[in-house]
Amino acid sequence: VPYKGADAELIESIENICYTVVTADNFRGSAIMVAKREPQHMTVDEWRELERNNHDIKYEYIDGHIYAMSSGSLAHGRIANNTIRTLEDALIAGGKACEVYNSDVATRISPTRYTYPDVSVTCDEGDRPAPDKLEVQAPILIVEVLSDSTEAYDRGRKFGLYRACPTIQEYVLVATRYQMIEVYRRTAQGWTAYQAYNPGDKIELISLDVHFPLAALYRNVGVPEGLDEHEGEV
């Protein structure tokens, strides 16, 4: 990965820590994995400096290790944009003072964990937009738009990271191969609530006290309503 930026010394130290593993699948929009070369960690400040100087790829930071974010399909991008627009409209209609951010904005889920969700929502006064603010500090809802390359991660380890963040109350997974939304909710007993929504359903997000039709998220996207019988499971 070609690094750009004035801080060549920092980039050289980062290259001593990690290397990028690229496969043919990367060119079809799958995840680019970054593996550490030596058993040493990058600090949060070093990661922030990397993000400021490198404009080609964004890196999530998890417990000292960085993971490059890949580009998605056109359907993925459209669904993410539809989700942002739909959430903003619902929040405005409900008079909610919340902010909706896209995947350009990092979200802090712990002092040593920062991700770039497809969509993050925060209702915290400290997360109002300002030139000096670079990260969402108190997300209440996270949305990830699924893809073949990231679905296992979004359902597995990444969901575990989000569950450990005390401010997150709901986690939404949006399918791209057919129209279905899954909502996981935190309750007094933990993450025990789950609900799947299908075409024709109205989605209810309890953490934001908003609702909207599932169809709004798939507007102008060529995604079938159901899974083709020959396609198998997600």
Give the residues covered by each predicted segment.
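Gly/Pro/Ser/Thr-rich low-complexity, intrinsically disordered segments predominantly at protein N-termini
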Residues: 2, 9-234
